Amino acid sequence: MYPHPVIPTEPIGSIPRPPALLEAIASYHAGALGHDALERAYSEALRDTIQRFEQTGSPVLTDGEQTKPSFATYPLSGLSNLASDGVVIPFSDGHTRQLPKLIAGPFRYGVHAEGYVRAARACTQLPIKQAVISASAISLLYPEQGIPGYSREQFLADLVDEAEADIRGALRAGAASVQIDFTEGRLSLKLDPTGGLLKAFIALNNQVLDRFTEEERGRVGVHV
């Protein structure tokens, strides 16, 4: 009898939030639940997700992105130099998400992914993979009309610095690997069928990856 073939797999990142957490978030936004209670709900969802992941026998775990406000916009938490009328991103299932728009520089991340890694590491001894958003996705925050006194070139330079710091921070905090979410790669072909925007996205992300050694890049993957 031939042995069953083994296909190496690992989780991508996101796991649907449990009903209890969804109810807690809704209650918080309705003013019926305090911040401390919401944080407890986030912590319980995180612990439950990781425990269930452990039971699957997966060689690497994720936090399920249970505590992120969004896989794409978590770095923007707490920033005051944004407006709400940014680029609208359409997804293949028909839903859309609208990004904020940067209105002043300099650009800095409000939150880095290392905090999510530390929270997950406190729940397990198994390897953790941390998802981070790509520099190319965040580049969509810069408005077409520009920002007086803050050029697009300076914004991109600042962005590359922040994206590098996001990855390094996650690795330093104990992530076994880091996954760069680059799902806007497909979107770029809708916005620009010539492929020019896609090439620009790839070039920007490569600027970030070029700052890592070959050994370090062995711990960084890209999700498209």
PLM region descriptions:
Residues M1-V224:
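Domain-level signal for soluble alpha/beta catalytic cores
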